[in-house]
From Swiss-Prot:
The keyword Ligase applies. GO terms for cellular component: cytoplasm. Consists of two distinct domains, a catalytic core and a N-terminal extension that is involved in tRNA binding. The gene is serS. This is Serine--tRNA ligase.
Amino acid sequence: MLDLKRIRTNFDAVAAKLKTRGVSEDTLTTLKALDEQRRALLVQTEELKAQRNIASAAIAQAKRQKKDASQQIADMQQLAANIKAIDAKLADIDQEITSIITVLPNTPHDSVPIGADEEDNVEIRRWGKPRQFDFDIKAHWDLGEALDILDWERGAKVTGARFLFYKNLGARLERALYNFMLDEHLKEGYQEIIPPYMVNHDSMFGTGQYPKFKEDTFELDGTSFVLIPTAEVPLTNYYRGDIIDGKELPIYFTAMSPSFRSEAGSAGRDTRGLIRLHQFHKVEMVKFAKPETSYEELEKMTANAENILQKLELPYRVLALCTGDMGFSAAKTYDLEVWIPAQNTYREISSCSNTEDFQARRAQIRYRDEADGKVKLLHTLNGSGLAVGRTVAAILENYQNEDGSVTIPEVLRPYMGGLELIKPR
C-alpha cells in the first residue's frame, strides 16, 4: 500500500509513476480531495473538542459555585452533537480513502522500463543455447502420457480441467526437483519453512492479493480461510504486525508448497500441459531486508533462481518487466523464462520482485534500526525458485530422446536413486 503522506507531498511525481501502471490521474485527484477534506475535518473536530473541554470546565465551576449551568450544558450538548456528526463524516471519508488506496498498485522503481504490456519488457541476458533436435520432438503432455508419468484424463475425471495425476517416475521427478531446489536455496542461507496452505483474509490483504484479486483465489465456504495462491502469502505474513531487530536482517525464507489459482481470465490459454494449472507445486523464496540493501538482495534472489536452471542445464532468458506488466505489489520484477522446444519459445518459470515497503505497510512489518533505535518499515522481496511443474515440462521437452525416453539431468540423479533415463513402459 502506498503512503498517503507521500502522495500528498509528492502528488505530481506519484501520479506520473502510477500513470505508467494504468492509473488515471482522476483517481489520484479524487484521493487528494478526500485527504484534504479529512484533514480539514480533523482540524474542526479538534477545535470543537477544545471548546467542549472549556464548556465542561465552565459547567464544573458553575456547579461548585451553585450557579445555573443550563446554558453551558446545552452548549456542550450541541458541541457533542457537532463532533459526532463530523466523526461520522470522517468515517465515511476514511472508508472512501481506503477503497481507493488499497487498490492502487506500487510505484515502479526508476530503473523499470516504461511500457504497456509484455511486448515492452526488456531482455537482460540469456543463458544456454536451445538444443537442436534431429528428430520430430513431442510436447511434454504427449511425452508424459507416453511414458505413463502424467495422467490428465483421470485428473479431469476426479476433479476437473487443469488438474492431473503425477505417477510413477513422474511423481518421483517432481519430488526430486523440489528437494533439489530446496537444498540449493539452503546453501544460500535460506531458512526452510513448511507453511500453512490456508490463510486468513488479513494475510491476503497483507501481500496485496486482497481486495483487488479475490476472483483469482479459492475461498473455503463457511470459513475465513483461503487456499494459498503462492507460499509468498504465509511466508511474508509470518512477521505481520511484528517489529524485527534490525541486527537480524536480512532474513531469508524458502518453502515448497502447493499453489491454488482459479486462473480467472485464462480461458482458452494453455489448456494442455503443465504451464497453467489450478494446483501446482512451487518453491518460493521470500526476503525481509533493510531499504538500503533491498535491490542488492533482489539481484541475489534472481541469481538464486538462475542457479537452479543452470545446474539443470536448461536454456533461459532474464527479462526486466515493464511498468505495465509488473505484478500489483512489485516495484521491480525480473522474470526468468525457460526454453520450451515444442512451443519454440521461452515461457515464464520464475518471477523475482522487490515490493519495497508496499507489502510491509499493508502488513505492518517493521524493524528497529540499531543505529538510531527508530522503528521503520522494512522491504519485502519474493521470487519463485522455481515453479516445479513448469520445470518438469522443460525437462521432458529439452531432455527427450528419439526413442521416446527422457534423460534425467545429472544433478537430479542422486535424488532418483541414480536413475539416468525415464523409458516408455
